[in-house]
Amino acid sequence: MKAFLNEQFLLNSPTAEKLYHEFAKDLPIIDYHCHLSPKDIYENKTFRNITEAWLYGDHYKWRAMRANGIPETHVTGDASDYDKFLAWAKTVPMTIGNPLYHWTHLELRRYFEVQDLLNEKNADTIWQKVNEKLQEEGFGARDFIMKSNVETVVTTDDPIDSLQYHQKLREEGFSVQVLPGFRPDKALDIANDLFEKYVHELAEASAISIQSYQDFLNALRARIDFFHEHGCLISDHAINEMTYEETTQEEVETIFHKRMSGYPLTEKEKIKFKTETFIMLGQAYCERGWAMQLHINALRNNNTKMFERLGPDTGYDAMNDEDIAKPLCRILDRLEQEDALPNTILYSLNPRDNVVISTLAGSFQDGKTPGKMQHGTAWWFNDTKQGMTEQMMTLSSIGLISRFIGMLTDSRSFLSYTRHEYFRRLLCDIIGDWVEKGEVPYDLELLGEIVKGISYENAKQYFQFDRVKQLHHQSKIT
């Protein structure tokens, strides 16, 4: 029997152990999609206590606490931070089988040297020990990033964001690359009651008077250029329902004017607007050499009562089960026909879509860029041992796992980088298992290179973040 969380955690063969410890363990991290605050990074935010660092904004933990019968006062409500921590400590032993149990103890060990298993009995002792450390030098937001051997962080930013903290971090010369990610969801959500207000904000941010759909597109392009100047090389789209409708820019011009004049739109008109706008964005990304991420099939804000009380991103989302194959194919094909399909990473929250995504990705590889079309890593509810394994097994069966760009945190917490360790261990265990079964040769040179690629080097090559340094160097010269 193995000891819990020992050096060989999740590594179930000698080959897996060798691959992890010799090839994966010490590689830098490229976290190409997260929800960290660039302001917190710039200010090297410190934390009053472990509750602030751990439980503020973590809807994974909130869901578990609610499922354990913890009242909302002790989840997101007005209970003290100490009482919220006690409620979490009471919940932790009940999370066995859930990755939260592993992540919790990995984070305690890696960042705070706490070997004990958190529970209700030792909660006070751990509270005091961890909080003492948090008051020491070297436990701010930047410190957690640097301790985790992170090379690049890509945040999630709205087109109207000023990017002032990315700029300040670059000017200051912070050793970790902190780059913006372009997330234009509000610009495509024409059905939202606040769309008109957002258009006015976009006009202000871009310094373009938006009187027409063409003006709207010009404003988005201006913001894309602004993001590009600030080092952005990645876009991201949350697509809860994958849709597609043939249309023309002239027709969408009419739809845009109708919406801005206060008239309701039909469902087909909404889809036509999204389709045409998305195609324009894809073209713009391709022109600038960006990668495009599509996060598909989330069913959000399901509990109306709690949404009205707490707002979005509070733990009341689920997997959607909309069909994605045909509309996604038509979007990709339209961009491909126009020679405007950027490097693309496809994620679905529903694991039944794994095979769909892997096969669709294979339909649009270009024979030039290794792994141009990526089946993205297991996401959100699939960010588990089972989910990660299934995603990698599907990818390896249908595509080239050797060209996979690997893991990201998708997190709002500065303690989440242990998820990269978790992923790397699972990756090495999968490949090690193939070796043990005689399904692949025991060729450490080959397998080690593949492990290094998936863990770090493929993402570095795929995104080419070094271009940012060249861009900024040129801007200084000019």
Swiss-Prot record:
GO biological process: D-galacturonate catabolic process; D-glucuronate catabolic process
UniProt key word Calcium: no
Reaction catalysis annotation: D-glucuronate = D-fructuronate; aldehydo-D-galacturonate = keto-D-tagaturonate
MF-aspect GO terms: glucuronate isomerase activity
Keyword flag Isomerase: yes
Keywords (A to Z) from UniProt: Isomerase
InterPro entries the record matches: Metal_Hydrolase, Uronate_isomerase
EC numbers, comma separated: 5.3.1.12
EC top class, as a word: isomerase
Gene3D superfamilies recorded: Metal-dependent hydrolases (3.20.20.140), uronate isomerase, domain 2, chain A (1.10.2020.10)
Record pathway: Carbohydrate metabolism; pentose and glucuronate interconversion
Family in the record: Belongs to the metallo-dependent hydrolases superfamily. Uronate isomerase family.
Protein name per Swiss-Prot or TrEMBL: Uronate isomerase
